Amino acid sequence: MHYSYIIKSNDKFINVRDVLKSHFLVSTRLLNKLKKSKLIYLNNVPVTPSKPVLLQNSSSAIFIHNIPVTLDSPVLPGDKVSFSMDFDEDSSNIIPIKMNLNIVYEDESFLIINKPANLAVHPTSYHFTDTLSNGVKYYFDSINLHKKIRIVNRLDRNTSGLVIIAKNEYVQ
């Protein structure tokens, strides 16, 4: 999943960090994860976690507007700030179990399932392998999607209805 924004002349953004926090409403936690994963870009150039150190006789640092590309790099009208949510996440604590999931909607951000009654949403000590999360984990594995199970809303075990699963931390 890739998100981008082109700076307009009337925008009040100061730097890359400001665009991510103010326009995209990226949390500090997610910002740190994106920064460490090197998945933030200014004009398609990766943003480095901190100011790069130039070695003697080296020109390996990346510059835009004559400044190293970092979260504090200034943005100008026409600049494109983007980030990608294309990284794997560990959900190995959920055991994948094949289930007949009633998927009513799916796109690159969300999965919506019609949950039947008498099915727990999350594993517990009483329901460790017979939950909706176990079925979703199996489904994600079958489509080669390595993401955490992010339940947006929760229904009690005895309640049927639609359950929304976010496919990444940003849309959750």
Language model regions located:
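RNA pseudouridine synthases
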Residues: 1-172
